[in-house]
Design a protein with these regions (language model features):
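Conserved N-terminal segment of class I S-adenosyl-L-methionine
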Residues: 1-108, 114, 118, 130-133, ...
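Short aromatic-enriched loop/helix-cap "lid" or pocket-rim segments at secondary-structure transitions
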Residues: 87-88, 157-162, 202-208
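Short catalytic micro-motifs in class I SAM-dependent methyltransferases
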Residues: 119-123
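A short glycine-rich, Lys/Arg-flanked "PGG" loop and its adjoining helix->strand segment in the class I
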Residues: 130-142
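Short, glycine-/aromatic-enriched active-site segment of Class I SAM-dependent methyltransferases
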Residues: 148-170
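Short alpha-helix
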Residues: 171-187
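A C-terminal cap/extension of S-adenosyl-L-methionine-dependent methyltransferases
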Residues: 192-248
Length: 248
């Protein structure tokens, strides 16, 4: 597994890039947890067992508690320094594990109701990706759900170039069609797919003056935030995506 030397946060000082990632990627995943809770009837007394792969310091759990979304949370990250500064490490409903998913996970098979992961799979070498997705499938309960987000390409268009993103630690951009096929061959069933924000994508937003909604977003939020919002709400492929699968 390739470990990125790129840091969006240094000593607690958040960058603008990191804030965009939290708002437009991790917020999506948190909302999917909320939706799953409602669908399955989970409450604070009947909590979802949630695994987050590439959890950084467990901040998604921290954000969820602020939104009154309570789960039994297991966060996995390969970098011990991140876990050492977790804001949720002392919570009784939190388990933090420093493990490399390409070498397997110590979590019991069939123990998790839901798995989420954002901006992780592009750091995993392509030959290791099938094994990683098989591991995630095995950890899910029957009826469980997996939601993963990452920068991607399609068979028709290359949104990302590895040579241009080596500095971010990226080693693989899964192809949309191939990734769905891979996961379905493992046993997953695609629940839905949504386009999403991706930092280095070659996706082009509408030219100013061509779309009133985009113009309004740009006038009020500025170009970077308008671009991120647009990539999140469009039905076009953007070079970033959220894949949600069920284990039926």
């Amino acid at each position: 597994m390739s470990h990125s030397q790129y840091k969006c946060q240094v000593q607690g000082k958040e960058s603008y890039i990191d804030n965009q990632f939290v708002i437009f990627s991790q917020s999506y995943l948190m909302n999917q947890v909320h939706i799953y809770n409602k669908e399955k009837g989970h409450t604070t007394k009947n909590r979802v067992n949630l695994l987050e792969l590439g959890c950084y310091n467990g901040r998604v759990m921290h954000f969820m508690t602020q939104q009154m979304i309570f789960v039994n949370y297991t966060g996995v990250d390969v970098t011990p320094q991140y876990l050492a500064h977790s804001p949720v490490a002392r919570r009784k409903d939190v388990t933090l594990l420093c493990e490399d998913v390409t070498k397997g996970l110590s979590i019991a098979d069939g123990s998790q109701d839901m798995i989420i992961s954002s901006e992780v799979l592009e750091h995993i070498n392509p030959e290791e990706l099938p094994g990683v997705m098989r591991t995630l499938y095995d950890k899910l309960k029957k009826g469980g759900r997996c939601c993963v987000a990452f920068p991607m390409n399609t068979r028709d268009k290359m949104f990302h170039n590895l040579e241009k993103e080596k500095g971010l630690g990226h080693v693989n951009f899964p192809v949309y069609e191939d990734f769905i096929e891979l996961c379905e061959n493992i046993g997953f069933t695609l629940h839905h797919y949504d386009s999403g924000f991706s930092l280095k994508s070659s996706f082009r937003t509408p030219r100013y003056g061509k779309d009133p909604l985009y113009d309004k977003l740009r006038d009020r939020l500025g170009s970077p935030a308008a671009r991120a919002v647009w990539m999140t709400i469009t039905d076009e492929h953007t070079g970033g995506g959220y894949f949600t699968f069920d284990k039926l």
